[in-house]
Amino acid sequence: MFPERVLSGMRPTGALHLGHYHGVLKNWVRLQAEYPCFFFVADWHALTTHYESPEVIEESVWEMLIDWLAAGVDPTQATLFIQSRVPEHAELFLLLSMGTPLGWLERVPTYKDQIEKLKEKDLSTYGFLGYPLLQAADILIYRAGFVPVGEDQVPHVEMTREVARRFNYLYGREPGFEQKALDAAKKLGGKRAKLYLELRTAHQERGEDDALEQARALLAESQSLSMGDRERLFGYLEGARKIILPEPQVLLTEASRMPGLDGQKMSKSYGNTIRMREDKASVEKKVRTMPTDPARVRRTDPGDPGKCPVWQLHQVYSDADTREWVQKGCRSAGIGCLECKQPVIDGILREQQPMLERAQKYMDDPSLLRAIIADGCDTAHKVTQETMREVREAMGLTYS
């Protein structure tokens, strides 16, 4: 029905580290070659937890965008924009809030989890309670087909689907819908119209899911239909309402296994990170001062790589021969810890090199980055204007 867009965003709340690269940005680089992708800076979302320190957001926005480009996100393949520069996000958030039950927001698992984790902040705010609905608006405003998330974010996408379903139920009704849908089917042409109606019957009366998918594919191939007729025919397949806001699907992404300097998951809150564009001297110092197996008090003491955080980084950055060298050398005390750490340092610096090269031109000429974002915001704005035109019309807000 709509282009199979991918929508994803990140909050600008500090420097990006290698955990962000391995957990999110590498996936974005892959997705941009497969789908029309919209990647955005979620600055309004950042305010839900940093409303008392907006300077953190301001400092982070442009640096984060440079990190995206450094990672290989390509503005010729994906649309990059800043959430607050596309005001339709806020308008749809407001309109969706009118019909979204409060209980839906309160039951989102991450709501209570975040309040527990961030006890030092006062998160008893309307904005923080409503951020899952703002996420829903971010997704639905682009009629995104797919949202790449980890397991912990699946409930947010499920709530988005419920919000879309409720909206379509409340506002997808229109006078004479069935006749308008039948008239629209005729525009498919005789044979295709007959096939469409047969597939609809097979789905609705006999519950054949394959028939539903075939009918959807048939409509997707019919380029001559207007947007309104297309919405009616998709809606008619499953009931008697237009599909104004389609339900997105989860693109489940594997959780980042990037270990931090202490062996825990790399995270800013643990203070165990290496920034994506950290300078060479700092990388060397951080890795060389990493803790190792406590059993290796002296150079001649054998150790167990399984008890050493450095070994986890070898699994990311070292090839099979190097890992075998580490296993044998550590267990026999044939190598010292500093020797063991050097291939990790080399691997990180090797990974960073193309990032630093890509980033340099945007650091040298910030106007290049500003132009990319201006173009991306324009592209995003065109999509959101079309969605909001139909949303306002469905909700009876187009007074003349």
From Swiss-Prot:
Residues 173-241 are annotated as: Insert. A motif ('HIGH' region) lies at residues 12-20. It catalyses: tRNA(Trp) + L-tryptophan + ATP = L-tryptophyl-tRNA(Trp) + AMP + diphosphate + H(+). ATP binds at residue 268. Residues 295-304 have a biased composition (Basic and acidic residues). GO terms for biological process: tryptophanyl-tRNA aminoacylation. It is found in: Cytoplasm. The keyword Aminoacyl-tRNA synthetase applies. Its EC number is 6.1.1.2. It comes from the Bacteria. Belongs to the class-I aminoacyl-tRNA synthetase family. This is Tryptophan--tRNA ligase. The gene is trpS.
